[in-house]
Swiss-Prot record:
Keywords: Cell membrane, Membrane, Signal, Transmembrane, Transmembrane helix. GO terms for molecular function: catalytic activity. It is a multi-pass membrane protein. This is Uncharacterized protein MT2350. One of its GO terms (cellular component) is plasma membrane. InterPro entries: Nucleoside_phosphorylase_d, Nucleoside_phosphorylase_sf. It comes from Mycobacterium tuberculosis (strain CDC 1551 / Oshkosh). Residues 1-24 form the signal peptide. It is found in: Cell membrane. Pfam families: PNP_UDP_1 (PF01048). Its main location: membrane. One of its GO terms (biological process) is nucleoside metabolic process.
């Protein structure tokens, strides 16, 4: 029998951002800076970020560093994104998000139009191991108050039809060793489901402190994605046999 499965599910929350437009003098002509709108996609720890980056086509110069945090520019299914790893906990998530908003403004030609968080978490109620949940609203105070996610993004999620894997396999999805046989670790024995709607909950387990990363902390506690996104770029490699002089 395989190793015990951890009770986890994938959760995603999205928050739309409004844009204000100020009236200008019709006779005034200004230099308009193109402002590309992107979605900020956040994950807490390396295993989560690696999963997102495995589906991200990176830009030619993908890495932006701000306040010692790395942001990765690219596209997911043709949609422009900024991918970032926050670190564990709400304080780290807040700091990473605030840094992103300070760095990516129209003055830099890239702005954030929406925020989405993707990661693993404990499940309750109708969810089971391996299920994917996209809540319609979120609470940070154990249900005292709720805040709804973006209606448009939630409506898009409600149109999704996906088939989820029920087998956990060994190996990293972005490993270059494509010819290595797949090793099956666990079989759920059921078909995981996608749930759109309902409630999601987050809470601060670190007493208002930023949870520290750990050097060489692996896929959970490290400071950056385990598989560095630069490795996703196509780099030509030539192998040749050494020839003895003769």
């Amino acid at each position: 029998m395989g190793a015990p499965l951890r009770h986890c599910l994938l959760v995603a929350a999205a928050l739309s951002l409004g844009c204000g437009v100020a009236a200008a003098d019709p006779g005034y002509v200004a230099n308009v800076i193109p402002c590309e709108q992107r979605t900020l996609v956040l994950s807490a720890f390396p295993a989560e970020a690696d999963a997102v980056l495995a589906h991200t086509a990176l830009d030619a110069n993908p890495v932006v560093v701000a306040d010692r945090r790395r942001y990765y520019l690219g596209s997911i299914s043709g949609k422009k994104v900024i991918v970032a790893m926050t670190g564990i906990g709400l304080v780290n998530a807040t700091n990473t998000t605030e840094t992103a908003f300070a760095r990516f403004t129209c003055a830099s030609s890239i702005a954030i139009a929406a925020v989405m968080f993707s990661g693993v978490a404990g499940g309750a109620g109708r969810t089971s191991i391996g299920d994917v949940a996209i809540p319609a609203r979120w609470t940070l105070d154990n249900g005292a108050t709720f805040r709804g996610v973006d209606p448009g993004m939630l409506a898009t999620a409600q149109t999704l039809s996906v088939v989820l894997d029920n087998i956990n396999t060994l190996g990293n999805p972005v490993c270059l060793c494509r010819n290595v046989p797949v090793v099956r670790l666990n079989h759920l024995g059921r078909q995981p489901q996608l749930f759109v709607g309902g409630d999601g909950s987050s809470s601060d387990k670190n007493n208002g402190q930023a949870f520290p990363c750990i050097p060489n902390g692996g896929s959970v506690f490290a400071a950056n994605p385990v598989v560095h996104p630069i490795a996703h770029l196509a780099i030509p490699v030539t192998f040749s046999r050494r020839r003895d002089p003769g």
